[in-house]
From Swiss-Prot:
GO BP annotations listed: assembly of large subunit precursor of preribosome
Species of origin: Candida glabrata (strain ATCC 2001 / BCRC 20586 / JCM 3761 / NBRC 0622 / NRRL Y-65 / CBS 138)
Source organism, top-level taxon: Eukaryota
Keyword tags: Cytoplasm, Nucleus, Ribosome biogenesis
Identification of the protein by name: Ribosome biogenesis protein RLP24
Subunit (UniProt): Associated with nucleolar and cytoplasmic pre-60S particles. At the end of biogenesis it dissociates from cytoplasmic pre-60S particles and is likely to be exchanged for its ribosomal homolog, RPL24.
Gene this protein is translated from: RLP24
C-alpha cells in the first residue's frame, strides 16, 4: 500500500482518497481534498497559508532540515528483492521513526523555551501601563470573599435550623412516649379491676 503526499498541504493521501491531476507533460499532482485542489488551481502559494506544512517548515515551526527526513524521499530506482535487505530495512524504519520523534520533541522544547519569560514580561508591562487592572483584581477578590462569607452564613443558618428541628422532634417523641406510658397504666388498672370482680 502506497501512501502519497498531498502536493499542496503535504498531508497523507491514502489509497482510494483524494484527487489526482495529471498535467500535459505527464506530471502527477495528488491532493488530499477539494480545498487543496481549489487552492492549487488558484495558483496560491502553500508557503503563505498557515495551515499547510510548507508554511510551518518555512516559518521554522517544524523540523525542516534533518538527516532522518531524507530517508522518506521517493526513489524511483527498482531494487532487486532480498529477504535480508527487507528485514533490515523494516528494523531501520522503526528506529528512524523513533529518532525523528525524539528530535522533533527536542526541537519543539527548544522553540518554546523562552515563552514563559516573554509572557511574564508582557504581563508585567501590561500591568505597569494599566494600573487600574490591579484595582479590578482587588474588587474581584473582595467580591469573592463576600460571596464566601454569605455562603458560610447560609450554611450555619441551615445547621441551626436543622438543630432546632431535631430538638422539636425529640420533644415530640418524649411526649408520645409519655402518652403511651399513660395508656399502658390505664390498661393495667382496667385489667386489674376486671380480675378483682
Amino acid at each position: 500500500m502506497r501512501i502519497y503526499q498531498c502536493h499542496f498541504c503535504s498531508s497523507p493521501v491514502y489509497p482510494g482518497h483524494g484527487i489526482m491531476f495529471v498535467r500535459n507533460d505527464a506530471k502527477e499532482f495528488r491532493f488530499c481534498r477539494s480545498k487543496c485542489h481549489k487552492n492549487f488551481k488558484q495558483r496560491r502559494n502553500p508557503r503563505k497559508l498557515k495551515w499547510t506544512k510548507a508554511f510551518r517548515k518555512a516559518a521554522g515551526k517544524e523540523l525542516a532540515v534533518d538527516s532522518t527526513l531524507t530517508f522518506a524521499q521517493r526513489r524511483n530506482v527498482p531494487v532487486r528483492y532480498n529477504r535480508e535487505l527487507v528485514a533490515t530495512t523494516l528494523k531501520a524504519m522503526s528506529r528512524i521513526e523513533e529518532i525523528r520523534q525524539k528530535r522533533e520533541r527536542a526541537f519543539y522544547k527548544n522553540r518554546m523555551k523562552g515563552n514563559s519569560e516573554r509572557d511574564f514580561l508582557r504581563d508585567k508591562k501590561l500591568v505597569e501601563t494599566n494600573p487600574e487592572l490591579l484595582r479590578l483584581r482587588e474588587v474581584e477578590i473582595a467580591n469573592r470573599l463576600a460571596k464566601e462569607q454569605a455562603a458560610a452564613e447560609e450554611v450555619s443558618e441551615e445547621e441551626s435550623e436543622e438543630e432546632e428541628d431535631m430538638e422539636v422532634d425529640s420533644e415530640e417523641e418524649e411526649e408520645e412516649k409519655l402518652q403511651k406510658q399513660k395508656i399502658l397504666l390505664k390498661n393495667k388498672k382496667r385489667n386489674a379491676k376486671k380480675l378483682a370482680f
